[in-house]
Design a protein with these regions (language model features):
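N-terminal accessory nucleic-acid engagement/regulatory domains that precede
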Residues: 3-171, 319
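Conserved hydrophobic/aromatic pocket- or pore-lining residues that grip, position, or stack substrates
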Residues: 151, 205, 247, 287, ...
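Short, conserved phosphate-binding/catalytic loop or strand-edge motifs used
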Residues: 169-179
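ASCE P-loop NTPase helicase motor core
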Residues: 200-202, 208-441
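Conserved helicase motor core of P-loop NTPases
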Residues: 346, 353-564
Length: 565
């Protein structure tokens, strides 16, 4: 147990210590790298543990900051190069007073009496060894460590448990041969081809209590899940199913994808009865928060003692699930139920702390499925036998340049045929060359149609503000599509209540997206959104007096189409 400072000494020490600590942290507060809450949390706790070293307290403030910026912990030695200072124009050029020897600072911070090991439950911070970097442990808050430990324990328990024989399909091979007719011509479950991956994914989810089905967009995850559902419902089996995703939009996409995958015209080879097809098309999908039953006070309706009433739980877009929500999900799913997690480790990360899927699944340079190969088993650890990785994306087969850029940016060096095998920096250069139009993928047939360059930065490596011409090009498709359709409808007798018109309007809106690499900075999401919004408002002001100001359509829950601007 850590010795504490007597109350009288603690009172005398606190004022001077707080003043020195806040003075040391002030440049980081001014640059908005640290928040007042990070500093106050350490300042209030330090006297209780006899911590009076300002440099160690600064390191602990960054550990307290980590969950606030979506990380469970921090490597202090690597911190300066990881911090994005472009939170505003002034902070972008700020020279922050980092300790001169970062490695020594990290080691010194870990020696604080406020930092303990995994088994020392009384300390507010924990140092956690890392397999890949054993010399530089992560520094975590105790809460984040406990969340990680509970997730790891729950996953390990579920991964080691197979479905009992009574819960398995009577003739899985025959079912797979029927659901994957192309595979049946070779060998069901074979490893040579994308259809083999799909069949293996279904076999995995049908026989294990935990299945991770991962891969990029268009690789066949939904295709496999639809056939898993068809296999489990085949023959009139009774099965309670819960479908969920982190957001309402993702849940709606999941539901729609399953409906499309079971459409008779779109999937004539899906050999299932009309009853099974109807059940699949009627399956609802909900948000993960609603599935777990989150309450306003932060508690959950479904827990270990009151599990989700479903025998099969499928969660899509798992890359967006944070550490705490994953822990809640694992505790809420019944121990006897199947849990299938779908996602792409390289897609959107969680907003809250912890990128669970990225930690569970090997990086994209491991291209073999989780059920094949010792290399993947070693990389994936105890979940290798519960993971199926999809490797071929049909979505980008007609756009090789885009596929090449994605492969470069995902991990610098993957097994893409157009990438150098062992030089990550060359892979990055290759991506920049494709962006610049000086190089193309070997299968690219329309190189001039894939990428439209909106200008070049004033200096290499410097983020500059977009020009008026660039903003006009970015806003053009929006103003000429969705906005033009909406303005026209508000100014004439278009029947706004017509469902066909509503679908057309929403489809026009869905065709416009501007994606940014950064959240902040001159080319980040926040400033681009503000700049584009100004142009849109200015364009819509033209002719405003000629519009009738019709109220539009109330879609419920505060959502409107056509509300006057």
């Amino acid at each position: 147990m850590t010795d504490t400072v007597p109350a009288a000494s603690r009172a005398a020490l606190s004022a001077a210590l707080r003043a020195a600590f806040f003075a040391r942290a002030q440049p980081f507060l001014d640059a908005r790298v640290l928040a007042p809450s990070d500093v106050h949390a350490v300042a209030l706790t330090a006297p209780r543990f006899g911590e009076d070293d300002v440099e160690r307290m600064l390191g602990l403030a960054f550990a307290a900051r980590a969950p606030r910026v979506s990380h469970p912990g921090v490597d202090l030695a690597a911190l300066p190069r990881q911090i994005d200072l472009a939170v505003d124009d002034d902070a972008a050029d700020t020279d922050l007073p980092w300790p001169e020897d970062l490695a020594a600072w990290a080691a010194h911070t870990r020696s604080s009496p406020m930092v303990g090991g995994p088994d020392d439950a009384l300390t507010p911070f924990v140092q956690q060894p890392r397999r890949r970097h054993p010399a530089t442990p992560l520094l975590l808050t105790r809460r984040m460590y406990v969340e990680q430990d509970r997730v790891a324990t729950a996953l390990a328990a579920r991964a080691s448990s197979e479905m009992p024989q009574r819960a398995r399909l009577d003739d899985l091979d025959a079912t797979l041969a029927r659901l994957f007719p192309l595979d049946a011509q070779r060998q069901v479950g074979s490893t040579d081809g994308p259809d083999g991956e799909a069949a293996r994914a279904v076999r995995l989810a049908a026989t294990r209590r935990l299945a991770l089905i991962v891969g990029g967009p268009g690789t066949g995850k939904t295709f496999s899940v639809t056939r898993l559902l068809a296999a489990l419902l085949d023959g009139g089996r009774e099965l309670s199913i819960a479908l969920a995703a982190p957001t309402g939009k993702a849940a709606a996409r999941m539901r729609e994808a399953i409906r499309e995958a079971t459409d008779t015209k779109a999937q004539p080879l899906l050999d299932v009865s009309d009853e099974v097809r109807a059940r699949l098309q009627a399956l609802p999908a909900t948000t993960l928060h609603r599935l777990v039953g989150m309450r306003p006070d932060g508690s959950a309706r479904h827990t270990v003692d009151n599990p989700i009433p479903a025998q099969l739980v499928i969660v899509d877009e798992v890359s967006m699930v944070d550490l705490t929500m994953m822990r809640r999900l694992l505790e809420a799913v019944h121990p006897e139920a199947r849990l299938v997690l779908l996602g792409d480790r390289d897609q959107l990360a969680s907003v809250e702390a912890g990128c669970v899927l990225a930690d569970l699944v090997p990086s994209s340079d491991h291209r073999d499925g989780g059920t094949t190969g010792d290399a993947v088993a070693a990389a994936a650890g105890p979940l290798a036998g519960n993971t199926q990785t999809f490797t071929r994306s049909r979505r980008f087969e007609s756009a090789p340049d885009i596929a090449l850029i994605a492969a470069c940016l995902q991990s610098y060096a993957t097994r893409h045929p157009d990438l150098p095998p062992d030089d990550p920096h060359a892979a990055l250069e290759r991506a920049l060359e494709v962006f610049a139009g000086t190089r193309h993928a070997s299968q690219e047939t329309e190189p001039d149609l894939r990428i439209e360059r909106l200008g070049r930065p004033a200096r290499a490596g410097v983020l500059t503000r977009p020009t008026e011409t660039q903003l006009a090009q970015l806003a053009g498709p929006y103003l000429g599509g969705y906005a033009a359709m909406l303005v026209a409808a508000l100014g004439d007798a278009t029947p706004l209540e017509d469902p066909r018109w509503q679908r057309s309007l929403l489809a026009a809106f869905d065709r416009y997206r501007v994606l940014a690499v950064h959240r902040r900075g001159p080319l980040g999401v926040q400033q681009l959104e503000q700049a584009l919004a100004q142009r849109v408002r200015a364009a819509l002001e033209v002719g405003r007096g000629e519009r009738t100001g019709r109220r539009g359509i109330d879609l419920g829950e505060g959502h409107w189409i056509g509300r006057p601007i």
